[in-house]
Amino acid sequence: MPKVIGLTGGIASGKSTVSELLSVFGFKVVDADKAAREAVKKGSKGLAQVREVFGDEAIDENGEMNRRYMGDLVFNHPEKRLELNAIIHPIVRDIMEEEKQEYLKQGYNVIMDIPLLFENELENTVDEVWVIYTSESIQMDRLMQRNNLSLEDAKARVYSQISIDKKSRMADHVIDNLGDKLELKQNLERLLKEEGYIEKPNYGEED
């Protein structure tokens, strides 16, 4: 019987890397961020609703959602985030559910890559929850480098979510990402072996 696994963690914890590795191991990944982009893609009903609620400033010169404007708006005004979520979340759920069911019908184990799985109380929609663990200092360093944020802004984004320690306590399994990519791969392989998804780990070798 195929399993549905919820993959989550903190911001900049390494979810994209783990998803890529899991796809190599034969899992099918349903990506919440990708579904969210599809929900408001150019010409979509979702984007039309965003314009209606948030005005023309929410749309850039290319007719796409102005992500910088909307990102700043919802980060600084929680009530605006709720309004945006009310538009996007139902569309995202439909996209992800359709994709998940298609993979399950084909007999695949499915990874639901959902950054805010606990924040949106979605843990009961999956069979297991796997959390990618890293330290807050590593999260902040990655955010400052990747997103060109100040330390203050990086802290604000990290602390806007449930702490990674609390998420780890609520998880069925925790994937350690305190080291480099090779160590992450080894930790993931160990979990997959323990859970019977792969035959044996392949430590020390890169694909």
UniProtKB/Swiss-Prot annotation:
Reactions mediated catalytically: 3'-dephospho-CoA + ATP = ADP + CoA + H(+)
Organism: Staphylococcus aureus (strain bovine RF122 / ET3-1)
Localization annotation: Cytoplasm
Entry similarity comment: Belongs to the CoaE family.
Keywords on record: ATP-binding, Coenzyme A biosynthesis, Cytoplasm, Kinase, Nucleotide-binding, Transferase
HAMAP family: Dephospho_CoA_kinase
EC number: 2.7.1.24
Gene name of the record: coaE
Pathway annotation from the record: Cofactor biosynthesis; coenzyme A biosynthesis; CoA from (R)-pantothenate: step 5/5
Gene Ontology MF, one: dephospho-CoA kinase activity
Principal location listed in the UniProt entry: cytoplasm
Gene Ontology biological process terms in this record: coenzyme A biosynthetic process
Record protein name field: Dephospho-CoA kinase
Residues where ATP binds: A12, S13, G14, K15, S16, T17
Record NCBIfam families: dephospho-CoA kinase (TIGR00152)
